[in-house]
Each structure stands twice: as structure tokens, then as C-alpha cells.
Amino acid sequence: MRAAPRLTIGLPVYNGENYLAESLEALLGQSYEEFQLVISDNASTDGTADICHRYGKQDSRIRYIRQPRNIGLQPNHNFVITQARGELFKMTSHDDLYARDLLKRCVDALDEHPEVVIAHCWEAMIDTSGNVTKLLQYSVAADSPRAPERFRSMLLDGWDDYTYGVMRTKVLRRTRLHGSHHFADRTINTELGLQGPFHMVPDWLYFRRDHPERTSPYTVRTGVCTWTRAGRTGCGTPLCVCTASTSGAISRPSGTRRCPPPTAKSATGTWPDG
């Protein structure tokens, strides 16, 4: 039997034809090549399947799975996690871009710091054309060696996309994964933070695309409630959960039993003026 690649990349997607090919080019062109890319197509109705099949024929590292029906946003994210075979895992989006050395820098950081559970990098927002519009600031003390400090900071000090970092698969699987509510990634971030410190690579290597169709914390703040859980009729159930409720779910005993006690310029974009 062929040995599993060390890293599994999960890419859940629904109707992603506008940006998917560009994102796949950035992932498949990484300097770190020892990975399998698992794409879960959530019953897309556009050209997503054709794009995946085309790239799958060109690169054997791609494993394409099409869901027979739409299973919902968060269940599709959880599905790619269940398919992970590597000791490391990274979640990706079909519309984002990645600098060529992103994976290598994060994997190297995990190798150099065995106590770290996630390695991520500085992040920038890009527009629909791939131009950098904003360099994001990180305020969360996720690198603290003290679990209580990490926990407090994640609840109170900010929002960072650590769930898009490279993480240890066994640690991720000790969490409850993504719930069907807004800020589910913040919940899982906090669970991961209880298990160990995070490492931030001090370079802008991850480029998040901001566009009208994107489901993100930014759309929540402008009053948009997306449909995240599949219902009996195949439609979704709209759920909005505030930060306080999400944080409360983490602090309940059922959420902490799984956690051990504590022991630039883009290749495709341009910098904004100023």
C-alpha cells in the first residue's frame, strides 16, 4: 500500500467556478509537494466539477469527491477532515490564494516547535482581481505557553483565521469540529488553543479574497445570515450565533474534556498605496 502523504489539504467547495482554477494553481504550485488535496464538491450546479476533473487528470495528488446532494456548509468542511490521511492537515478555500512557500514555511515551523499545534502566517485581503487591499493585524496571544492566557485572548482580543493554518491532524480530531452556526471557526480555534500554542510565520503568505458571494465573518457583521445546515427538504437552516454564545459553548465541560491539561507582495497582486 502506498504510504500516505504527510499533509492532507482539504478544499470544500460549492459553485466555485469563478476562482477555483486560480486557487488550484496556487496550491499545486507549492514548493512543498508532499500532500494530497481532497476536494469535496457539495453538489455544485456550475462548472466546478469540470474544473476539478481537468486538474485531477493533470495531478495525481488530487482526490475529487462529489457529494450526491448538498450536505450543508459546515458538514462539507467536516467531511474533508474525516478524509485526512496525513499527520498534518490544512483547510483551504476555493477563492483564496497562497504564496509559493506557504506550506513549506508552516511545516518547517511545526517541525522546529513540537509543542505547537498550528502554524499559520500573516494574512492579507485581496479583491476580485487578486490585488492586495488590506494587511490584517493579529492581536490574539495564541503563541502564549499558558493555556489560560490563550483562552482568554481568543475570547476577548480578536479574530484570526487560524483554522486555515497547517495543524496536527490528531489535535484537530480531538475537537468537536465545525458546528452549524456562524463563528464556528472561532469555536474550533479556541478548542485548539486549549491543546497547545500556535505559531505565526511573520510573512504575508496567505491572501483571502473578499467578494460579494463569500461567506465570512464580514458578511455576518453586515447583517447577512447564510444557510449553513442542510434540512429535510434539502434547503439550509439559517442560523446566526453571536460570539458570546459560541464562546460559552467552549467553556462548558463537554467542550473541554477532549483537551489535555496545559503543560509582502503576492505573486498575483499588488500592494495598496501607503
Stretches found by the model and what they are:
Residues 89:
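Short aromatic/hydrophobic "clamp" motif used to bind/position activated sugar donors
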Residues 101-135:
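Conserved donor NDP-sugar-binding/catalytic core segment of glycosyltransferases
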Residues 67-84, 97:
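Glycine-rich, basic loop-to-helix element that forms the pyrophosphate-binding segment
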Residues 15-29:
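Short, well-formed alpha-helical segments that are part of the catalytic scaffolds
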Residues 41-50, 69, 93:
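A conserved acidic beta->alpha catalytic loop
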Residues 4-7, 28-39, 47, 60-63:
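Short loop->beta transition adjacent to catalytic acidic/histidine clusters or analogous donor-positioning motifs
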Residues 21, 46-54, 101:
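Acidic helix N-cap motif at the loop->helix transition within catalytic regions
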Residues 9, 82, 99, 143-222:
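Conserved nucleotide-sugar donor-binding catalytic segment
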